[in-house]
């Protein structure tokens, strides 16, 4: 089971839509998810190590380097609402 977090700048509208997209992707790929959480980048930065995968906008990926060093897979997205991009990058991550 994977624990997934999705982050955007403010943690309100966009991260909720990202979470809904991620829900569709994991369902389509038949991935078992323990916890799926959406939040702001500041909350995400401090909580990232509690998750297996973090999705965030590509331009904020550097904020999560410490979490990556501790084993969290951080996936930056160019189009944060693209189901296809999220699915492709999830497959490329080696986590599934």
What does each of the following model-derived ranges do?
Residues 2-41:
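Conserved active-site segments centered on acidic
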Residues 38, 56, 75-77:
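Structural signal for conserved beta-strand scaffold positions within catalytic alpha/beta enzyme cores
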Residues 47-49:
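A short, aliphatic-rich alpha-helical micro-motif
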Residues 52:
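Conserved acidic residues
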Residues 68-71:
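Short, structured coil segments at secondary-structure junctions
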